[in-house]
From Swiss-Prot:
Its EC number is 2.1.1.192. The keyword rRNA processing applies. It comes from Rhodopseudomonas palustris (strain TIE-1). This is Dual-specificity RNA methyltransferase RlmN. Keywords: 4Fe-4S, Cytoplasm, Disulfide bond, Iron, Iron-sulfur, Metal-binding, Methyltransferase, rRNA processing, S-adenosyl-L-methionine, Transferase, tRNA processing. The gene is rlmN.
Length: 399
């Protein structure tokens, strides 16, 4: 298989760096950083920790959107905070609701300083009978060029800040009424799980992703357990161990091939970090056990990686790793060179892997009709034409 021009590059370079606005948001700051910002506006050292805890509670427990809501903070302090800061999160530009209940939000990030353009990202809420999962983005665009992924065709504009990542969770909670003492207008369904599987490669934005997930998992705030947060990477090997040590969330690997020559084409990052290095990093992942298995994501591509020989090789590769295998039917998008494997072939592949002792669920495609399924996200900064959108919807309806 000859690599396409689009996938020839292993990584893309960001077109921009983030420039903070003149009045920055406090969303995404650690407690220590909040104390520093309070010091910047004249709060005395003995009061900073207490004030920071008040802000933390209002932002992450009650979802305050304005300092005026913070009724146990003095009027003078609220005025000072409002003069210098905001608690803004991204703006909802559009909301789409799939026939299966999946929701996709197009979010406009606050524009930065020096006239920096406001950019857009997407996040997706997936309701299920026993959980509600939010798929969160880490970059505007993506560093990588995975051949089967729509997001990978987009430019990498810039990394998101910790505040912009946390802000996606807060927007979803706003829309779902998922804050304490709030009405729940959308069926009383709560966000119980977070997956870092939206736009971008999280481990190429490690510091911001780490800081955001530590806030999201803080039990005095949003409080989503680290065991209910999954970070998916295409294999940035040097940061895999750091993920376990510094964040402690569940790990997922976008594997998709069992031979280096094929993975070089599907996931060009493999040329930098080949399978042997990637799988060793998984064996060494801190905290991995039968109770905390690593998920290996495997998109099923017709005639490419879906043979029983591929299944046998997959089982061999994962020997010694506490693992489960998530088989993903390929989600079509206009211009893609791939097709989804036939369902009977997916079932045979799954059965072989299951009989070898690995959990191998087939992911149910969700939100295809609104371009919200795995591999379909692409922000409005890289708009689809009407023809492309109609073509994609037609493909979704024929599955």
């Amino acid at each position: 298989m000859t690599p396409s021009a689009a996938s020839a590059l292993v990584e893309k370079t960001p077109l921009e760096t983030y420039v903070p606005p003149a009045k920055p948001s406090l969303i995404g700051l650690s407690r220590a950083q909040l104390c520093d910002r309070l010091g910047d506006v004249g709060v005395a050292p003995p009061q900073r920790k207490m004030r920071a805890q008040q802000l933390w509670h209002w932002m992450y427990v009650r979802g305050a959107r304005d300092f005026s809501e913070m009724t146990n903070v003095s009027k003078e302090m609220r005025a000072t905070l409002a003069e210098h800061f905001t608690v803004d999160r991204p703006e909802v530009v559009a909301e789409q609701i799939s026939a299966d209940g999946t929701r996709k939000w197009l979010l406009r990030l606050p524009s930065g300083g020096d006239g920096q353009k406001a950019h857009e990202v997407e996040c997706v809420y997936i309701p299920e009978t026993d959980r509600g999962t939010l798929c969160v983005s880490s970059q505007v665009g993506c560093t990588l060029n995975c051949a089967f992924c729509h997001t990978g065709t987009q430019r990498l504009v810039r990394n998101l800040t910790a505040g912009e990542i946390v802000g996606q969770v807060m927007v979803a909670r706003d829309r779902l009424g998922d804050w304490i003492d709030r009405e729940t207008p959308n069926g009383n369904r709560l966000i119980t799980n977070i997956v870092m599987m939206g736009m971008g490669e999280p481990l190429y934005n490690f510091d911001a992703v780490r800081d955001a997930l530590l806030i999201v998992s803080d039990n005095e705030g949003i409080g989503i357990s680290r065991r209910r947060i999954t970070l998916s990477t295409s294999g940035v090997v040097p940061n895999i161990k750091r993920t376990g040590d510094e964040i402690g969330v569940m790990l997922a690997i976008s594997l998709h091939a069992v031979r280096d020559e094929l993975r070089d084409e599907l996931v060009p990052l493999n040329r930098k970090y080949p399978l042997k290095e990637l799988l060793q990093a998984c064996r060494d992942y801190p905290g991995a056990s039968n109770a905390r298995r690593i998920t290996f994501e495997y998109v099923m591509l017709k005639g490419v990686n879906d043979s029983l020989d591929d299944a046998r090789k997959l089982v061999q590769l994962l020997k010694g790793i506490p693992a489960k295998i998530n088989l993903i039917p390929f989600n079509p998008w206009p211009g893609s060179n791939y097709e989804c494997s036939d369902w009977d072939q997916i079932e045979k592949f799954s059965e072989y892997v299951f009989n070898a002792g690995y959990s191998s669920p087939v992911r149910t495609p969700r939100g295809r009709d609104i371009l919200a399924a795995c591999g379909q996200l692409k922000s409005e900064t890289e708009k689809l034409s009407v023809r492309e959108r109609n073509a994609l919807r037609a493909m979704a309806m024929t599955d």
